[in-house]
A protein has these predicted regions:
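Intrinsically disordered, low-complexity regulatory regions in eukaryotic proteins
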Residues: 1-88, 92-149
């Protein structure tokens, strides 16, 4: 027996088009938030790199201002300007000399740039698909309104 392929009810088609539109809209929002987070990460990495580079010219110990939160700072003395402690992930902290720490930051910056580029491409793709879904939704909605008259 051959199956009878009846067209989908119009309200179901409209609902599917709206779901597709909503999905792409949500993905755009998520990707935008992730790009914003990556931008802040890149800024923090740049600041850390700049600070480490300035430490390279220091000798012995140095007076520094340390942020302790909520726009509050404390004066402190940096006992060792040749080595720093670097979080390498998973709660693991290792001692590195300043040039090695700078290389680590540069590698992280490249990784952030690569992820940002991939995310920007996805964002562009989602935007195009959302635009197509929106056009289809408007077109189909207008078609249904025309039938109601």
């Amino acid at each position: 027996m051959a199956k009878n392929h009846e067209p989908k009810p119009e309200n179901l088609v409209l609902q599917e088009k709206y779901i597709a539109y909503s999905y792409y809209k949500q993905q755009i929002q998520v990707a935008s938030e992730e790009l914003s987070t990556l931008s802040m990460t890149k800024h923090a990495l740049g600041f850390a790199k700049e600070t480490l580079e300035s430490m390279g010219s220091m000798k012995g110990s140095a007076d520094v201002i340390v942020p302790i939160g909520a726009q509050v700072f404390a004066k402190a003395k940096l006992a060792d300007v040749k080595d720093v402690l670097v979080n390498i992930g998973g709660g693991v902290i290792v001692k590195k000399d300043v040039p090695a720490a700078i290389k680590s930051i540069e590698a992280e910056e490249k990784e952030v740039d690569n992820i940002s580029a991939q995310l920007a491409a996805k964002l562009k793709d989602f935007s195009e698909k959302m635009g197509e879904a929106e056009a289809e939704l408007e077109q189909y909605s207008a078609k249904l309104k025309g039938k109601e008259k």
